[in-house]
Amino acid sequence: PRFFIMENVKGIMSAPLKHVPLAERDKNDPEQQLGTVLDVILSEFQKLGYKTVYGVLDAVNYGVPQFRERFVLIGSRDNENIFMPIPTHFQMHQNASYRWQTLGDTIRDLEYDCGECAAFSKERLSFLKLIPEGGNWRDLPTDLRRIAMGGAFESGGGKVGFYRRLSYNQPS
């Protein structure tokens, strides 16, 4: 095709061709170097005659009511100048139609129908009631965090999705 758009997780920019745990990575093996996946992708498109630009875009900056960062690669075979898209929406703007869309903006007019909603246990509900809009398990009282999280409390990572409540006044 004359043009293409490819999207992926932003981690593709730092992904090595050969995945090896960090502690076991051989600094002298080029395939284990960070960013080698992207290097190969760019090289292959260049061999096919494409001029490319790439970057990380966040859907919230383009009218989607969600923070969602994605790697985007745009290519052209026509030797035309191509650019990453300019954001259309902003956290603050004097014109409301150019501001980030919130969860509330998106669902405000929907009819409430809980037909088949997930049923939470009494214990889980008791934790969720303590978490403010836009918060997560870290907003629980300190003495309840370990109880609420169970075995996941000791696991690595940020765990921000656990006991998460969306904010009606923010993108999700």
Where are the predicted features?
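Conserved Class I SAM-dependent methyltransferase catalytic core
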Residues: P1-R68, V72-S76
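S-adenosyl-L-methionine-dependent DNA methyltransferase catalytic core
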Residues: E44-K47, R70-S172
